[in-house]
Amino acid sequence: MEVSGESHSGPSCSSSSRDGSGVSVSKELLMAGSGGRGGIWDRLFINSKPNSRKNSTLQTVRIERSPLLDQVRTFLPQMAQANEKLRKEMAAAPPGHFNIENTDETLGQVIQMDVALFEMNQSHSKEEDSSEENSQDSSEESSESEDEDDSTSSEGEVTIDNIKLPHSEDGKGKIEVLDSPASENKEKQENK
């Protein structure tokens, strides 16, 4: 494409010549890969020539109603009613009645869960970087666990044998029921 004296029918662009050859580099770049139709130029403008592939017969279809949507629509009013009922009960009840930290024995069984979350699978680079931190943390934890062990070993709650530290080898959790009615009954029978 030469610039000398030609009038371009397409959109105007700045021509830059290299070594006086008169080749419009920007025009060539815009026309590249076009196959003579305008190339990227047509895609840059919103009101460019419509692409024949985009004008294929697309139809709007109706999607069936989701049963999940019906369930949500019935659940939300029930939730709103329950919230309103709870607000009224909270206004009428004495202060502290709905405090979740106050548990009475009359309320029934209470499940206390102490959960520790930590990442099990770490990448090698993270393990190498955190190995120093882990050694410092483990020394601090061991000193803390010894202090706790001295104070609680008489009660039999936490010992070196039953303490579970993150990144241990066995990887299995231990569930222990504390202060259950069955264990209280056993203790009473043993004391008799």
Swiss-Prot record:
PANTHER family: NOP PROTEIN CHAPERONE 1 (PTHR28674:SF1), SIMILAR TO DNA SEGMENT, CHR 10, WAYNE STATE UNIVERSITY 102,-EXPRESSED (PTHR28674). Client-loading PAQosome/R2TP complex cofactor that selects NOP58 to promote box C/D small nucleolar ribonucleoprotein (snoRNP) assembly. Acts as a bridge between NOP58 and the R2TP complex via RUVBL1:RUVBL2. Its main location: nucleus. InterPro entries: NOPCHAP1 (IPR027921). The modification Phosphoserine is found at residues 34, 66, 180. It comes from Bos taurus (Bovine). Residues 129-152 have a biased composition (Acidic residues). GO terms for molecular function: box C/D methylation guide snoRNP complex binding. Interacts with NOP58, RUVBL1 and RUVBL2; the interactions are direct and NOPCHAP1 bridges the association of NOP58 with RUVBL1:RUVBL2 even in absence of snoRNAs. The interactions with RUVBL1 and RUVBL2 are disrupted upon ATP binding. GO terms for cellular component: nucleus. Residues 164-177 have a biased composition (Basic and acidic residues). Keywords: Chaperone, Nucleus, Phosphoprotein. This is NOP protein chaperone 1. The gene is NOPCHAP1.
